[in-house]
Amino acid sequence: MAFLKQEYKFLAIFMLVFAAIIAVLIDDNHTPDTREGVYTAVAFLFGGVISIASGYIGMMIATQGNARTTVSARNSIGDAYKVALNSGAVMGFALVSLAVLGLVLVYVGMKAWVPADLPNYILMEIIAGFGLGGSTIALFARVGGGIFTKAADVGAD
């Protein structure tokens, strides 16, 4: 968990800098009164927060599931398999549900926040910022986790 906390500190700084870049650079000339970049940056940050929460929740479920699987393996391999399968199912459903909930919240929130005359295609571009934020954090978490794992393997040798 210490690695996740340290990684998320650096990712928070990156997210803020990248959100500022998005807010400044993204603009649609067809709607001069609306700053799509600001809305997209907010959606980007929210996607990052959802991805960070997913990573943390997934790590907690995986850690507890591994411990429970190890204890169940003392009884039988079948019990251990059931516990591992249930832990994986809970983690998968929880994380996908969190992502869908985040997407719905972004859509409803942006629909209420942006001007009513904003074209739907721009709203969809704003919502794409949510996916970009989630994907960015997931990418960095995967790469950072792989580097951490490799360093731990080298340290163990």
Which residues fall in each region the model found?
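Hydrophobic, small-residue-rich transmembrane alpha-helices and their short perimembrane loops
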Residues: 1-157
